[in-house]
Amino acid sequence: MSVTVEVADEETHDVPLVEQVRTTPDQNVDVKVQENNVVTTKIGPKLETIPAAKMQDDNGDEEKAENSEGAAAEKVEKQHDDDGVVVHEETDGVASSRSSHHDKQKPGETKKSGDGKMDDDDIITTARSSSRRICGSAASSSDSETADDAPLLPDEGPSHAVRLEMPGDKPASPHDRFPKTPLKTLVAFLMLVVAAAGNTITLSWIHERYPLTPPLPDIVFELIPKIPWGLRLCENLMIGSFVSLLVLILFHRHRWIVLRRLCFIGSILYGMRCITMMVTPVPKADEDFECSPRFGENATFSLIVMRGVWSMFGLGLNLFDNQKVVLCGDYIYSGHTLVLVVSALFIGEYSPRRFYILHWLSWLVCSVGVIFLVLSHGHYTIDVILSYFACTRVFWAYHTQAAHPSIRLSVQNHQAKEFWFPLLRWFEGDIRRPVPRRFDCPISYSQVCNAFRRVRPRGRNGAARPAFE
C-alpha cells in the first residue's frame, strides 16, 4: 500500500499528518471512497458519515488502479515547496512521506486558511490495497502496553547488536577452542605458592601473639563431648579428597585451564585468610593441644620468617609433625574446611554429570571431615562457617564470570568491583564459553611407544646399524 502526504505552506500553518490507516473518532476523520479505487481523507471540524461510492468488482481492470496510484504519487512530488521537505520512503512495499516542518497539531484540531475555508492541502490521498495491519500512532485508542501492535522497545536511540552465547553452539573462531596457555597457569601457581608462604609466615607471627586464655564459648563444644581422634580423621579425608581432585585434573582434556583456576582461587582464599588471622587472634580451641614454644623476648623478624617457611613443608597438618614445629592461632577462618570445600566444588564442576555418585561422595567426605574437625576442637564452629561462605562465594562468582563473557564484559557487572577481577579478565580472556567435561589420557599411546622404542645400536663410525643383519 502506498501512502503519500502533502505538505502545506507556511501561510496556512497546516501541519502534515502522520500516515495512519486505522481511522478513529479521536482524529475526526472523514473517509470517502472514489470510483477510481482511491481513498480520499479530508480533515473536517466534525465527523460526517458519507456512504461509500461504487466499488470495483473482482473482475475490474487492475491496470487502471495502478495508473491512478502512480499519478497520485507524482502529483504530490511536484507540489512540495521551500517551507517543507517531503521525504518518500518505502518499506516492505509501503510508501510513506515525512516532513521537516516544525509546527505541531493536536489530535482533533483543524486549521483553516485566511478565508475560513478548508485548503486543498488538507487532503491526504492514499491508495487502497489489500487489508494490512499497521501500528497506529500514540493517539490511537487501541495502543496500549498490552496491545499486540505496540512496539516492543521505544525508538529513543540507536540500536545495538546483541550476541547471545548458546552453550550448544559450535566454536565460531579459534578462540573457542580453549587454548592451553601454560604461562598463565604458571603465574597462577606462583600466586598460590606466595599465598601459602604468606599464610605460614603470618601463622608464625600469630603464634607469638595469640592470647593464653581459655577457649571461647562455642555451642558445639558445650553440647557434644570432644573426640580426640577427629582431627586426624579430618586430615586423612582432606588429603584423599584433594588427591582425587588432582587425578581428575590430570585426566581432564582442558587440564591447564582447570589447574589454573584451582591455583588462582586458592591464592585468593589463602590471601584473605592471612588478613583474617592477623587482625583477630583468638585463643586455642583445644586446651590439651600442645604447641611449639614461643621465642618470647628473643623473637626477631628473621626467626619468625624462617620458622614459618620451615613449617610450610609440613603443609600445616598434624600428620606431618616430624619437624616438631606445631604453630597455633590459625583459626579464623579454617584452612581444613577450605581444602575440603574447594575440592568438592571442583569435583562437582568438572566431572561428568552422570557421575552423580562421585558428586554426592565428595560432599559427604567434605561434610564428615568438617563435622569431625569441630568435634575434635580443632577449630571453632564460626571458623568452619566463614570458610564455607568464603569458598563458595569466590568459586561461584569466578566461574559465573569465566563461563559467560557477556556478563564479564558488561559495564553493569557489579562483580567487576572485586579486587581480583582484573586478574580474572586476563586469565579468562581467551575463554568464550563453559569448559566442557571431557577427558583424555595426558600421554598418548604413540608417545608411550616412542618412549619405550628400542634404540638402534650404532657402529664404531657412528652410523646406525640396520635393524636386521
Swiss-Prot record:
GO terms for biological process: ceramide biosynthetic process; sphingomyelin biosynthetic process. Residues 40-177 are annotated as: Disordered. The chain crosses the membrane at residues 186-206, 231-251, 262-282, 300-320, 327-347, 355-375. Residues 72-91, 100-117, 162-177 have a biased composition (Basic and acidic residues). It is a multi-pass membrane protein. It is an enzyme of class 2 (transferase). Pathway: Lipid metabolism; sphingolipid metabolism. The active site is at H336, H379, D383. It is found in: Golgi apparatus membrane. Its EC number is 2.7.8.27. Its main location: Golgi. Keywords: Golgi apparatus, Lipid metabolism, Membrane, Sphingolipid metabolism, Transferase, Transmembrane, Transmembrane helix. It catalyses: an N-acylsphing-4-enine + a 1,2-diacyl-sn-glycero-3-phosphocholine = a sphingomyelin + a 1,2-diacyl-sn-glycerol; an N-acyl-15-methylhexadecasphing-4-enine + a 1,2-diacyl-sn-glycero-3-phosphocholine = an N-acyl-15-methylhexadecasphing-4-enine-1-phosphocholine + a 1,2-diacyl-sn-glycerol. It comes from the Eukaryota. InterPro entries: Sphingomyelin_synth-like, Sphingomyelin_synth-like_dom. The keyword Transferase applies. GO terms for cellular component: endoplasmic reticulum membrane; Golgi membrane; plasma membrane. GO terms for molecular function: ceramide cholinephosphotransferase activity; sphingomyelin synthase activity. Residues 376-469 are cytoplasmic. Belongs to the sphingomyelin synthase family. Sphingomyelin synthases (SM synthase or SMS) synthesize the sphingolipid sphingomyelin (SM) through transfer of the phosphatidyl head group of 1,2-diacyl-sn-glycero-3-phosphocholine (phosphatidylcholine, PC) on to the primary hydroxyl of ceramide (N-acylsphingoid base), yielding 1,2-diacyl-sn-glycerol (diacylglycerol, DAG) as a side product. Functions as a bidirectional lipid cholinephosphotransferases capable of converting PC and ceramide to SM and DAG and vice versa depending on the respective levels of ceramide and DAG as phosphocholine acceptors, respectively. This is Phosphatidylcholine:ceramide cholinephosphotransferase 1. It comes from Caenorhabditis elegans.
